[in-house]
UniProtKB/Swiss-Prot annotation:
Quaternary structure, from the entry: In plastids the minimal PEP RNA polymerase catalytic core is composed of four subunits: alpha, beta, beta', and beta''. When a (nuclear-encoded) sigma factor is associated with the core the holoenzyme is formed, which can initiate transcription.
Protein name per the record: DNA-directed RNA polymerase subunit beta
Keyword terms of this UniProt record: Chloroplast, DNA-directed RNA polymerase, Nucleotidyltransferase, Plastid, Transcription, Transferase
Catalytic activity: RNA(n) + a ribonucleoside 5'-triphosphate = RNA(n+1) + diphosphate
Gene: rpoB
Family named by the database record: Belongs to the RNA polymerase beta chain family.
Native source species: Euglena gracilis
Cellular localisation: Plastid, Chloroplast
Top-level taxonomic group: Eukaryota
Single GO BP term: DNA-templated transcription
Documented EC number(s): 2.7.7.6
GO CC, one annotated term: chloroplast
Length: 1082
């Protein structure tokens, strides 16, 4: 229980606490398992209790800029002895380098921001299920690490055991005998006639046969197996704590499931009694006496964050290290000539460091940070993925796993998930969820006692396993102002034992702390979400993460209260770590003078202001009172403009001024997607729901020229160009501004060293770095050119800007590592909105811009204000996202009343139709205050007669209009549209390559052929399939025919058809091509 009436959501505590726990406990626990490594008198001892960590030598910003890894060093003292004589005594060695988590939960790896996605997997323990297809009953025993065991009972009530994914099964009795179960215990617990008969039959063969049978499952081709090796293999497989561990959670769940009292609390390996208890439980399930487990309940799943994932990876790495050290000890023992023992040759930190780097590079849970905006960054850090080590297989996921479970309430958002093949698998954590020390999700609740909400008793965090014993109610049940539940005799909606039902207030034990605690961050930003279909809210949540940062930022008129929470935890903002006075503020840094007063009293509130503190001190008696003032300066360095992982321009801007007093936790610098503590993802624009000349058919959108020319939806993007400098005449390459055959326009912005100037405006094919390569080969052609011109043959290999890029150079950096130097150039590009760009609202209403209309031709309001955007009204009834109508109308009243609103979801606690009445009330208030009667007409509320801008005539019917918060998404037409005149061809089919990255061409596919056939254009179709495609002979002659004005040759056989014939011949089908004269065609 947490003291206090309100819970403060710490959105990134899961990652921070997990990584901190790994450094304090997890790493030491794994090191203790290889504390001593010995062989023939040699002994290596790691003093695991004295592990030391050293801070990184470079800053996080330096690592980002130079493409390095921001990591800490792990140092461990080592002792090496030989026959009790010290060769090395208590010497610290560099054990490994581990990437260090930043304050915002990210890792800087090779100059890129990465995160480790939280993994949600089945908790260690035993689970009993029923196969829905063949009605077979099976149990699965899952350890923390080690082999999985599957127990299956067949129709004859015989139980068989499978190990991991091996298809071969062995009888349960044989497996129990291998584990060492006595005959007495077997008859005592499994007194079943079938098992007794099977046991008597197996006793005639002896116990050795069972060991050999088990060993053959793993090594079927091995012969001459010794009994000792087979027994040793089984014992190490399930009874060695270093290779098999149920874990604290797994042992507890096994004990509570199959034992009446908790046995083997300290022993976490597999015991024969565990297997015997599972078999007994299966027999009871076969008789129908006990229920099956619900696998998808959150009580059976736990969350593994970065700390647990790193610890499991270290377990594997340290086992490899132990084997490597043992091999080196054996080599040292067999080669006594090696008299001097060198620890540096014996142990190398790169052995572990390289494997950790591979873990961060290859693991599917390690991903590049989605930093398109503040919301996308935080949502990515709070994702839950079932994939990864010991997780689900993408190709074998069942529908049951994707469905919403009742235990997810308040723990996992039931709305926000991925769209497509990962729908229902990639989830997002709820706002106020907490993870306990074992990895189970907990949701906060208030205690309810005899119908009264006890808010003063604090908040209770309850897991899914604990919740089944209580009756919980949502926050939006009807209640009075005194926090008592209304009407003790009225039935209220509650949840009890995973079932939603109705109950009286006296039976309720807990109640939710807010109406939006079950939603994620993105879902909570959608106002009036209760009036939308869940699928559209899902789309709105996902598209907010895809919204671009605009040049002119604007906060929405309607907020939900999540904005401040997101900004506080986002990496885009900078928070003051203590109170003080700003003495310097610029784009590079902010300096705050921290002033602390120390006396014989203690100030508990660290957020005190300067004047309040002096006021308090004046009230205190000054007798025997000494006041000491401590002054420190804290410097906050702001990151220079840089490119995000998705090519978005990122910069931090200070919002405090010199002489201003700031308090602890206050935002002192804004990011590109924040404005004074508010999150800015789009713009408030005037929209009308109207069909206009068919241009907004099927979700197409019509916009005004004003949005283009006034840069309303203009965004800034960053391109990065990197090249290596080889300024060596011996190798025939150098950099220079004097480039052969280059026009003056393309090199006018170069400096004398051949590198472009900062602030230069570049266009298509401008030279960024001038590079010249001299041909050193003395070929006859080069000798002739030298004899004619007297100079060596030089080739232009300069770095040039792409054809579609127009921008400004923002930074030029020369990075040198040892003998290699590279140049990094950043170019900022300003993109206006254009036809083909994708826009969306917060309610899943998305569309593509189809036409840009002059402002004078757009429909206008009765007061002459032209509409900025025209949306299709038919997109609302079928999609059932009415929330956008509420938002647009309330935004309209917000503009005229000069008010801002905070809307909580599910606000109809006291009265029904609360949203509708509130919007109509504000519209009517705006009408009275502005004396504009068209703002609210009782006959058609929310609508007015608009006028056509082309002829100034009113439309036939009233039109709904208002201000909507519209987002510009990252799916821009400039990144997708592509065309080519010439380009590469495939060497096999002789057809153009596919894809924009390869400068490919557009293929004329099967459906396009059908379209041409439908019009009967036979000659056009023949030309498209031959000369314009892969008729190589006529394709090369087409240019000469066009120049000379002659007719094209007769079409030849295309290469694709020849390839088809060759493939048929490869299948031993004798097929050939002949001409009209029955001549074989090659």
């Amino acid at each position: 229980m947490v003291n206090g009436c309100r819970v403060r959501s710490n959105l990134l505590d899961i990652q921070r606490n997990s990584f901190r726990s790994f450094l304090k406990k997890g790493l030491v626990e794994e090191l203790r398992k290889i504390k001593d490594i010995a062989h023939e008198g040699f002994r290596i001892s790691f003093q695991t209790d004295n592990v030391k960590y050293k801070k990184p030598k470079i800053s996080a910003e330096f690592a980002l800029k130079n493409g390095e890894t921001y990591s800490l060093s792990v140092h461990i003292p080592v002792e090496v002895t030989y026959n009790n004589m010290f060769l090395v005594r208590n010497k610290y060695i560099l054990f490994a380098k581990i990437p260090l988590m930043t304050e915002k939960g990210t890792f800087i790896f090779n100059g890129n921001k990465r995160i480790m996605v939280n993994q949600i997997i089945r908790s260690p323990g035993v689970y009993f299920e029923k196969n829905r297809y063949n009605d077979s009953i099976f149990a699965t025993l899952i350890p923390t690490f080690g082999s999985w065991l599957t127990f299956k009972i067949d129709q004859d009530e015989g139980i068989f055991v499978k190990v991991d994914k091996i298809k071969t099964a062995i009888p349960l009795i044989n497996f129990l005998k291998c584990l060492g179960l006595s005959r007495k215990k077997f008859f005592l617990y499994l007194n079943d006639p079938i098992f007794i008969e099977t046991l008597q039959e197996s006793e005639s063969y002896g116990i050795r046969l069972e060991f050999f049978e088990f060993y053959k499952i793993f090594f079927p081709n091995e012969v001459n197996v010794r009994f000792g090796n087979a027994r040793k293999f089984l014992r190490s497989k399930f009874m060695d704590p270093r290779k098999y561990d149920l874990g604290e959670v797994g042992r507890f769940r096994v004990n509570t499931k199959i034992y009446r009292s908790e046995f083997f609390q300290s022993n976490r390996t597999l015991q024969p009694e565990d297997v015997l208890g599972i078999a007994h439980y299966l027999i009871e399930l076969k008789k129908g006496m006990i229920p099956f487990d619900e696998i998808d309940d959150l009580k059976n799943k736990l969350v593994r964050s970065i700390g647990e994932l790193l610890q499991s990876q270290f377990r594997i790495i340290l086992n490899e290290l132990e084997s490597s050290l043992k091999e080196k000890l054996i080599f040292l023992y067999k080669n006594p000539s090696e008299k001097t023992f060198r620890l540096s040759r014996f142990f190398n930190s790169y052995f572990i460091t390289n494997r950790i780097r591979k873990f961060f590079s290859v693991n599917p849970l390690s991903q590049l940070l989605d930093d398109t905006n503040s919301l996308s960054e935080l949502t990515h850090k709070r994702k839950l993925s079932p994939f990864g080590p010991n997780g689900l297989n993408k190709e074998r996921t069942k529908l049951d796993v994707r469905e919403i479970n009742t235990s997810q309430y308040g723990r996992v958002c039931p709305i926000e998930t991925s769209e497509g093949k990962n729908a229902g698998l990639i989830l997002s954590l709820a706002k106020d969820v907490r993870v306990d020390k074992y990895g189970f999700l907990e949701s906060p609740f208030y205690k309810v006692l005899r119908g009264k909400i006890e808010t003063n008793k604090g908040i209770y965090f309850i897991s899914s396993a604990q919740e089944k014993y209580f009756t919980v109610a949502p926050f939006d049940v009807f209640r009075s102002s005194q926090s008592n539940l209304l009407d003790k005799n009225k039935l209220l909606g509650v949840k009890r034992s995973k079932i939603f039902s109705y109950s009286f207030s006296k039976n309720i034990d807990f109640i939710s702390i807010s109406t939006d605690q079950f939603t994620s961050l993105g879902t909570g930003l959608v106002p009036f979400l209760e009036h939308n279909d869940a699928n559209r809210v899902l789309m709105g949540s996902n598209m907010q993460r895809q919204s671009l940062i605009l040049l002119e930022k604007e906060v929405p008129f309607i907020k939900t209260g999540r904005e401040a929470l997101i900004n506080r935890e986002s990496d885009a903002t900078v928070l003051a770590k203590s109170s003080g006075k700003v003495i310097y503020s610029s784009l590079k840094k902010i300096v705050i003078q921290e002033e602390e007063y120390c006396a014989n009293i203690e100030f508990f509130n660290k957020n005190y202001s300067f004047f309040n503190l002096l006021g308090c001190l004046n009230e205190i008696s000054q007798k025997n009172f000494k006041l000491i003032k401590k002054v420190n300066q804290k410097i906050y360095f702001l990151e220079s403009p840089k490119k995000s992982n998705h090519g978005v321009y990122i910069q931090k801007i200070p919002i405090v001024h010199e002489g201003e007093w700031v308090r602890k936790g206050q935002i002192i610098a804004d990011g590109m997607s924040t404005l004074r503590g508010g999150i800015c993802l789009g713009k408030n624009v005037l929209v009308a729901y109207l069909g206009w000349e068919g241009y907004n058919f099927e979700d197409a959108v019509i916009i005004s020229e004003r949005l283009v020319f006034e840069d309303i939806f203009t965004s800034i993007h960053m391109k990065k160009f990197k090249t290596f400098i080889v300024n060596d005449e011996k190798k025939g390459e150098n950099i220079s501004m004097f480039i052969p055959n280059a026009s003056l326009k393309t090199i006018k912005n170069l400096k004398n060293n051949g590198i472009i100037k900062i602030g230069s405006e570049i266009k298509a094919q401008d030279v960024l770095i001038g590079r010249i390569k001299v041909k050193l080969k003395n070929t006859p052609k080069n000798k002739m050119l030298i004899a004619f011109f007297g100079n060596k043959v030089r080739k232009d290999v300069s770095l040039r800007s792409p054809r579609s890029l127009v921008g400004i150079v923002t930074s030029v950096e020369i990075l040198c590592k040892k003998s290699n130097c590279s140049v990094l150039i950043h170019v900022a590009e300003k993109r206006r909105i254009q036809i083909g760009d994708k826009i969306a609202g917060r309610h899943g209403n998305k569309g593509i811009i189809s036409k840009i209309v002059p402002s004078i031709d757009m429909p206008f309001l009765p007061d002459g204000t032209p509409v900025d955007m025209i949306l299709n009204p038919l997109g609302i009834p079928s999609r059932m996202n009415v929330g956008q109508v509420f938002e647009s109308l309330l935004n309209l009243s917000s503009l005229f009343l000069k008010e801002r609103y905070k809307i909580q979801p599910f606000d109809e606690v006291q009265t029904s139709m609360n949203s509708k009445s509130f919007v109509y009330k504000k519209l009517n208030e705006a009408r009275k205050r502005t004396k504009k009667d068209w703002l609210f007409n009782p006959n058609y509320p929310g609508k007015a007669f608009l006028y056509d801008g082309r002829n100034c005539r009113p439309f036939d019917h009233p039109v709904a209009f208002g201000y909507a918060y519209i987002l510009k998404l990252i799916h821009m037409v400039k990144d997708k549209i592509h065309a080519r005149v010439t380009g590469p061809y495939s060497s096999v089919t002789q057809q153009p390559l596919r894809g924009k990255s390869k400068n490919g061409g557009q293929r004329f596919g099967e459906m396009e052929v059908w379209a041409i056939e439908g019009f009967g254009a036979a000659y056009l179709l023949q030309e498209l399939l031959t000369i314009k495609s892969d008729d190589v002979l006529n394709r090369s002659e087409a240019l000469f025919s066009l120049i000379n004005g002659t007719y094209f040759s007769k079409p030849n056989i295309p290469e694709a058809f020849k390839l088809f014939i060759l493939e048929m011949q490869s299948l031993c089908i004798d097929i050939k091509i002949f001409t009209n004269n029955y001549k074989k065609f090659d």
